[in-house]
């Protein structure tokens, strides 16, 4: 055993011998196995990985399917459930898209059907996991200990010819004659039945009212008979002689056993076997239930009573008030009630009786409809899942039985689902066809394959689908109506033994499926046509192919179900049964002939003679058959109808009842008569499917094709032959059976009961007073019996020789109910008294007391812009400078400005630096105006800051204009200027349509603005900071020169980090750089950082941490900001005050400052990052005015936001947005056709209507909602579209209401996105796989995890130059721009001092390639080596290619260093490298190197380039000029944490092989534990009765 092997491995094998451990081990194994299965089944992986898993599970199944044993079967069941679990998890978590009500309804309907199918599969495996295969239990040797048994044969309207055989077979049962009573329960009250009963010696019982159909009939019989056990046979079920000997043994052995059911075997073919071409080779429909399901139910002590062929303990039925009458399936409901009271049930899988199948499909459907109604009634009225008394195993078995009859709607959904795509264009499974294939195929394959193995010879693959499809459309209405009104419906008797004079096609039975087949055929044509003639991409073609295949399979199933409707001719009154029996024939001359039968029937036999001699036809012979084992010895007269050498056909000559009895005994009495009921070939799914196809072919075979709505009627009888069935009087009557010894010379013993209210049987005299009479209608009050004072009724004449008649009973009034204490008084004989005593001794109960129950960088400068003269750039003078910029240079990156009738206003920003003033300005415009415009009414007006500049006139003959130059008054200019163009256009004189295509004007993006500016003398005060170093109006990259007299002093780096990150925070999205020099620049502004720097022109030294603005000695208009102090610590204090308290410095030029106190930072609290622990309002990210716009098509509104890139959501669940939109009130905008488009990072997300809520919703919102008047929409942000820096864009596209001709359309409308809309990232967890340099490029991660970089150590060489110091400041500026927080906590370490104080946080290496060898210790976990001016893969990564085979390959564009044979020179290149920290496994090292500081500077500047950032990935990036190459070579490690269940999902989601192995281990553990527990329970079930029997025998 597995657990023993594990304990032995752990050297704990002694524990295996401890009983408690041994008993608990299967449960531990099962718990672990279930956990592993749930873990493996609940993980969603990539489609490619799932394809590998699919191949593995299918291959394993093919490997194991040929192996025998229940252990293998249990494992394959678990494997099937594992695969199906994976499929359903994938369906529920990945493939549901509910974009429209129709799609939502269709998608959810299919998912519900699939969930039902999975539930049914699980319950089927549970039921059939371990068929008990119970064997008969021997009876006591002394027959005097055998109980009295009453055999009931209920009948209502069946033909007597059908009932005779059953009664004669029951009378022939091998049982002591004085302990066997056979009763005909005739609810039809027919005199012919009464006469037959008297003739045969059977009892005969009728009642005065037919309440509750069969159940009422049985309850009435219970009250007037006394046998300890009751056996029930339907009127067509003929028992074998050994029925009681094989069943009563278990009943006697187990006093708690209330029921022992045997199979219902049918010796005539059912409609599927008879009507389908291959039906005779297919197991009957009922074989699976009686051959497998019931045997499995017996294992769980949940055997169902099936209404016939069962032995029942009388006290058990009386204890529940009789047979159930609340539903039309009284049998199953009765068993349920007994089991609720604590009684046991059992099943013997040996057919001990045989009956007739329904002859026609319509009758079969009617019978199944009744069964379905009854089981659904039980579900609604007495649900086994609720109430007390049942064990959980029994509840599941009943749930399986009840839920089975809900199949109609799911079956119809499965058949019709492809119509949604082919006819309606609805994609109800939101996945690629390949994904559907790799998930759905193993689910279907394992289900079919495992069920084929389990069901074997009892049910063939694909035939369940045919059976269900035949019934589905009839059951849909029944299912719905019964669930809604469970008390509706009556018991209907199924006709048996009918004939068909001719073949016909029963349209009445198949017309719903004919209609469905026509629809499916049209869908098939649509699918084939779509694949062949419609244009689509590969994905659409695959969708068409998949749905066409689906509809083809559905059509095959439906056609097979239609083929069943072709009813074959049936003119044989007595069905034949194949049987080979040794017989002897004696002719009229006494000659004996030995023969063997080939088939037998109640009408005759076919036999093979052992001689070639041919007997003459019409010869009378006597057939002899002797079976000593079964006690059969018959002599039956017959006539030869057909004879040829070695073969003849005989017809029985039935002269009297004794001959008929012998015929029945010969055909049905043998104990092994039906032992071959399951002799079919084991199922093979492919062969079974071919049989289905051949059956469909039979639908089109030649023959008589008569289409009828009902069965053809037999020829009418002659008028003289019309004999109406004579009926007995509608009164109660009990005819006592005649013992076999008294049958000769006496016909019957007759008891006339004109009324039953005062009769009291001894067996019911002790009935509990609380019991309500079975005949009572539900809800009625039992009526007290009237006094017995009526005169006795007259006696019927008695035949001679009958037994004495008991006293007559006073009649009851019409409609009077039978009290619990009344019954028929039978003579008290020894057998009856013995039965009473035995009942009390063995069960401890009596009828009086029955057994009881129980989850700053911007876009780089455009290369097409005109170059700036270097001389102008370097010149510093008081003179004027003239610059010319195109509209494209000014930020118009989307092409020309286009003005339309509905969007007449467009513009752009013209920025003037704060240290300059405009002295002259002009604009030069070019473009085009629509030639259809009216010149006198159309023009484009130009304004600057709402000041008029000029007008562009329309010239229809020359649509193009320009260049046109307008001078602009310099006084119009401010810092941030709005240059606007307003279009006014008309194309006709009366009225114009704003949306007409002829209303347009375009301003070229190559139009120019020319400004002449001059510098302004600075006012050097600290309160103006960050001016003049930073101008917020400028959109160009920020360049801040820095003077560091001693860049090699590491102490100055922390102060420079504060300064650089502060400017980075200010610059935000613009690039910011810090060129470092050791001397003051020749011109412009600069920042000086160092110890003891002069703070004024006189050379005064600092007296403490000092900030001072002084004139650039080389440029009188330039300013130097000095940060100094007496030591490095004071310089750092000055920098910290500048970064955190610049607004408190005052209007002074120099100030000695005091340090500021900073609160400790927490992870992920950077001001730039959107909080992930609460919803965030849009108004927290941008001003409300930025989310408003005017006109029908206002400019795009942008919502930028930053996120930590390590956000991880459960299976990439999107993050919600609650979006509120405000639109104009009144009849201005056509809200039905207007929309709002939402984009995320330039990717389209969704479109939303502007239509407001209903009037009632709008009114109610105004009472309680702060968003009253706004329209709410729900959107979602997919995680794969989110990065460190993100931008949501909102584009309104409104349409004006059509006001008719010459009605003015307002154009001054406003629309907005409410600033109280919010984003919500609370479902995200911080978890990332590192190294990932894309995270570093997007958001400086993992260093930005702490906003102040307090867990970051920058390691630099012992000696650094100004270039390296400048790169360091560039990098700190990048961090500040990313986090919007100065780097107050960053640590700077000398590589020489690192061994003494190794950093515990994240490490950033900054060095040139020449210093790379000094950093080898920090890069020991990197897969690369930097030696000899080259970077190559280290020797320790020689086996890296093997790892690469199993890693996740979702990183597009990445190369593997091993496979690429990386060996690149570093000369002229920059290197960005990520690795795991050598000091902590959850920390990172990022190295930024280059052969020169300028290469390092280029690498840092690339981190703020929108062109470069997407190309920075993996764990290594090489930059050569503008070319970036990314590599991923080393395995990744993780940073952050997840809940354990999410971590398992993530871990297995990227490791399909591990998932596969864990799933198999889990399935194996569950299977091993299940086999052990099931085997133990099977032994207990079979030994329990034997132990009780031994105990009882010992007590006697």
Swiss-Prot record:
The active site is at residues 187, 331. The chain crosses the membrane at residues 25-45, 106-126, 396-416, 421-441, 505-525, 544-564, 1553-1573. Substrate binds at residues 234, 236. Residues 1-749 are annotated as: Catalytic. Residues 750-1596 are annotated as: Cyclic di-GMP binding domain. GO terms for biological process: cellulose biosynthetic process; UDP-alpha-D-glucose metabolic process. Signal peptide: none annotated. GO terms for cellular component: plasma membrane. Residues 570-669 form the PilZ domain. Residues 145-238 are annotated as: Catalytic subdomain A. Keywords: Cell inner membrane, Cell membrane, Cellulose biosynthesis, Glycosyltransferase, Membrane, Transferase, Transmembrane, Transmembrane helix. One of its GO terms (molecular function) is cellulose synthase (UDP-forming) activity. InterPro entries: Cell_synth_A (IPR003919), Cell_synth_B (IPR003920), Cell_synthase_bac (IPR018513), Glyco_trans_2-like (IPR001173), Glycosyltr_2/OpgH_subfam (IPR050321), Nucleotide-diphossugar_trans (IPR029044), PilZ_domain (IPR009875). Residues 783-809 have a biased composition (Pro residues). Its main location: membrane. It is a multi-pass membrane protein. Residues 315-375 are annotated as: Catalytic subdomain B. Residues 769-812, 828-868 are annotated as: Disordered. CDD domains: CESA_CelA_like. It is found in: Cell inner membrane. It catalyses: [(1->4)-beta-D-glucosyl](n) + UDP-alpha-D-glucose = [(1->4)-beta-D-glucosyl](n+1) + UDP + H(+). NCBIfam families: CelA (TIGR03030). It is not essential for cellulose production in this strain. There are two conserved domains in the globular part of the catalytic subunit: the N-terminal domain (domain A) contains the conserved DXD motif and is possibly involved in catalysis and substrate binding. The C-terminal domain (domain B) contains the QXXRW motif and is present only in processive glycosyl transferases. It could be involved in the processivity function of the enzyme, possibly required for holding the growing glycan chain in the active site. This is Cellulose synthase 2. It comes from Novacetimonas hansenii (Komagataeibacter hansenii). The lineage of its organism: Bacteria, Pseudomonadati, Pseudomonadota, Alphaproteobacteria, Acetobacterales.
